[in-house]
Amino acid sequence: MSDIQIGLSKSARRTYALDDVALAPTRRTRDRRDVDTSWQIDAFKFDTPIVGAPMDSVMSPATAIALGKLGGLGVLNLEGLWTRYEDPQPLLDEITELPEADPASATTRMQQIYAEPIKPELITARLEEIRDSGVIVAGSLTPQNTQEHYETVVQAGADLFVIRGASVSAEHISTSHEPLNLKKFIYELDVPVMVGGVAGYTQAKHLMRTGAAGVLVGFGGGSAMTTRKGLGISAPMATAIADVAAARSDYLDESGGRYVHVIADGGLSRSGDLVKALALGADAVMIGAPLARASEAPGQGWYWGNEAHSRDFPRGVRTPLGVVGTLEEVLYGPSHHVDGTSNIVGALKRAMATCGYLDLKKFQKAEMTLVPEYRG
């Protein structure tokens, strides 16, 4: 892809967001009832490629269990309210009632709420609650807190471990502390690790070489994030997913057959976004906003991420999304909305069938078109 000159001393690469691309239907169509949306990472197989984002407004132990029983994977935020407070419900209620007209005071109060220390015994209790339900157990920590709490996570019986930050590299350099050695950490861990976010080919390939089972693709693209405004950094998702999918293919050859899963994470607000992410090369999608619209979601129709309460530099906001139905209706319908906010698995099956594909791996070969002028 050729560079575009910004000025005499600087050029830039043209990249594309999900809104800039669309799928092209093919000559052959399929019956959507024959479409298989299953996804498997390591020894764990799921009916759908839906991963619940580790955000307090999206995933509680109860919603992680519910999502697991509906065929997806719920990832619990192990630095959230459920591991800081014995009973977080009053605080969740308070966050949803903070004044929308005064975002500064709302952010200040959220920072105060999240200042409570993480309690290892609550990490254990929450993960054991999920495990006792019989679903696959997954928890998430940031790179900064992984070293301190990972043993608690593993001992509590996590099946999958997620290391999730705004941007994670295999070669973080710091003069103030000893950074997490991802390759050594993953090698010594008996649990499969998904790690991210990443935004490009080189960064992703380096993470794949650490032994990660999956790589999360995305940087500051979520609907509740203000990273682009605050830091001036952005990675349009269509290009990011395609680049990381290319890294996966090259690493497959380099490693002699080791397949690392690509999980699109961020900016996937409606069913069409999920469909395009999977067609661009993602194996699965980590979603927040679509699940935050479920009646069971702990945010009660409000959506916020971990960046919203950062002590040093908040890069997120509470966003009112409203409730569109139960979690089952959000995933499988029936849908009473025409905007892609419910029956998202049904939408995926219909799109795959329309484009002539019966499984997700082959769907990654779907033809795409560029429609940068279209916003409908």
Where are these regions (language model features)?
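Alpha/beta catalytic cores of nucleotide-metabolism and tRNA/nucleoside-modifying enzymes
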Residues: 1-27, 96-97, 114-128, 232-264, ...
